[in-house]
A protein has these predicted regions:
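WD40-repeat beta-propeller superdomains and closely related acidic/aromatic-rich repeat-like regions
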Residues: 1-332
Length: 332
């Protein structure tokens, strides 16, 4: 299921419904399976393209963080119960490989190192922790954030970890000495609403393009009424080396939206998924303009996405209980 990419021809190819609203999703490395999480605290494994479903029980709360191992043999999940679970997902009956107590409270994001040996996790306890993928042993923890940490990524060469928090601070950690090297300013993603006594926004998602030396960070701005879901999606384009803001990407007409995840396409196009009271959108950006170069309206509020580069396929997890698979090329 792959043709030449054309974002203007993006269309939904498959959709499968679960019993409860979905939260997160990831595509297996081979593109033949999609994992999702639901508000009933379970995980789901869906075959692609058939849509056959298996349900995994193990968490005691919602799961926002999902990652496959580099070989696709295991799925790792981080829950709001503070637990990280490794699952064998190629077995006829998928099972728990190990479960650890990882954080005090919500786990917001996890990432697997490029060599597949290390897992990074972050959450509401403001800690960055590294774990052995093979044993679950804690390798180290790093402190330095002042608020909840929402996002984490590894540099493709494995030398650094980046973590983004509620205040719009992106910390860059040097893994050679496991110390904070520098901080990138992404504070346009942070909002303080004194009338509602609320801090809102933050670096909800990040993606690094080494060839372009650019980091994109997604979230929201113009949060005039956070509790009323009035806030608009925003993506920042930052220089990785010095943190200079190169461009702010905003979207007209989406008055209730937040960018939950961002990724790069191989041609350098940045993609974000927005979900909120205005609905769900796939948003496409390049460096030529601040507004999106294309938007694809999804049928329902979206909470997460994952792109499979080899097949030009996008999975999205939706509040209307659906996992949807969209193709970024013309219908055949």
């Amino acid at each position: 299921m792959s043709s030449a990419i054309d974002i203007t021809k993006t269309h939904i190819a498959y959709q499968w419904k679960y019993d409860r609203p979905l939260i997160a999703c990831r595509i297996a490395p081979d593109g033949l399976q999609v994992a999702s999480s639901s508000e009933d605290s379970t995980l789901q494994l869906w075959t692609v393209p058939g849509g056959e479903k298996k349900v995994l029980n193990g968490h005691e709360s919602w799961v926002h963080a999902l990652r496959y191992s580099t070989d696709g043999g295991q799925l790792v999940s981080g829950g709001c119960d503070g637990k990280i679970i490794w699952w064998s997902v190629r077995d006829e009956s998928p099972s728990i490989v190990r479960k650890i107590d990882a954080h005090a409270g919500w786990i917001r994001d996890i990432a697997v190192s490029p060599d597949g040996n290390t897992l990074a996790s972050v959450g509401n306890d403001k800690m960055v922790r590294l774990w052995s993928m093979s044993s679950g042993e804690k390798l180290c923890e790093m402190a330095g954030h002042e608020r909840h940490i929402y996002s984490v990524l590894f540099h493709p060469d494995g030398s650094h970890v980046a973590t983004g928090d509620l205040l719009g601070k992106i910390h860059i950690w040097d893994l050679s000495d496991r110390k904070l090297e520098r901080t990138i300013d992404a504070t346009p993603l942070y909002a303080e609403n004194k009338g509602q006594s609320a801090e809102f926004g933050g670096v909800r998602a990040m993606a690094l393009n080494v060839e372009r030396n650019e980091l994109i960070a997604g979230g929201t701005h113009k949060a005039t009424n956070p509790f009323g879901a009035v806030h608009e999606p925003l993506v920042l384009r930052l220089n990785w080396s010095d943190g200079v803001l190169k461009k702010s990407h905003s979207c007209e007409g989406i008055t209730g939206g937040l960018v939950w995840r961002v990724q790069w396409l191989v041609d350098g196009t940045a993609v974000g998924v927005s979900g909120g009271s205005t609905g769900g959108f796939l948003l496409f950006f390049n460096d030529s303009q601040e507004k999106e170069i294309h938007r694809f309206k999804l049928p329902s509020l979206a909470r997460d996405m994952d792109i499979h580069q080899a097949s030009n396929m996008v999975a999205t997890a939706h509040h209307d209980n659906h996992i949807r698979i969209s193709c970024m090329f013309a219908k055949e």
